[in-house]
Amino acid sequence: MRAEVEESMADSQGRIALVTGAAQGIGRAIALELAKTGAALALADINEAKLAVVVGEVEAMGGTATAFKLDVSNQESIESGAKAVLDRFGKVDILVNNAGITRDALMMSMKRSDWDLVIAINLTGPFLLTQALLRQMIKNRWGRIVNMASVVGRAGQAGQVNYAASKAGLIGMTRSLAREVASRGITVNAVAPGYIETPMTAVLDEKVSAAMLANIPLARRGTDLDVAQAVAFLASDAASYITGQVLDVNGGMFMG
């Protein structure tokens, strides 16, 4: 049975996967993990130089990857990027809405511009990109959509009202869309990482980092591979009966 599950997770030959925020961190790890499954990759990011490096890494593994410059805060960029991917590959089977940012501040001092930017990239961007690609998934009657949420969207966090709102909103979007498209063979799920070792968390104050670690029952930070493997599972045939769910990857930091 285990061999059958592993085979189903590793068999994405002929499928096209689009990953946003693929130039570094969790997005890069997702790209490399999906490459192992045999999927051809459309890798999107605003940072073309770093994205080219990831494309090279995928190709060195024997995989197929094409880079697309995409600014998920800009509707025109999203629409033109989606068209470019479809023109290149003809379809998108797997969509991973991974791109995201933080702009932390306490509520009383948070700038409206920081609220707007976080919502634009973390929530509106996934909405627009999913909308741009959904029709062809419905036509093909198969699709996997995986949205990158966060433990912060599940439990909240002081100083991150914008980020928490964006990720909680993404979870709500995930569940609602899952109900809309289930009859078309499309699953929609979210992965909610906890304290993961990434460039985004590397800048945290040592005291903040230590306090977060103390709240993790498994007593370690997660890795981008931990998250990438969860995404690859949800994108696979092994997860064909899972939709509208949030897969928490947080070492027990949040249980709910």
PLM features: what roles do these ranges have?
Residues 182, 187, 242-244, 250:
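Short, small/polar-rich loop/turn modules that mediate ligand/substrate recognition or access, typified
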Residues 10-41:
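Canonical Rossmann dinucleotide-binding motif of NAD(H)/NADP(H)-dependent dehydrogenases/reductases
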Residues 150:
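Residue(s) in the substrate-gating loop at a strand-loop-helix junction
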Residues 106-107, 111-119, 212:
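Substrate-binding pocket helix/loop in short-chain dehydrogenase/reductase
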Residues 48-49, 70-81, 112, 225-226:
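The beta1-alpha1 cofactor-binding region of Rossmann-like NAD(H)/NADP(H)-dependent oxidoreductases
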Residues 135, 179-183, 240:
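Alpha-helical segment proximal to the catalytic Tyr-Lys
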Residues 130, 166, 174:
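Active-site helix of classical SDR
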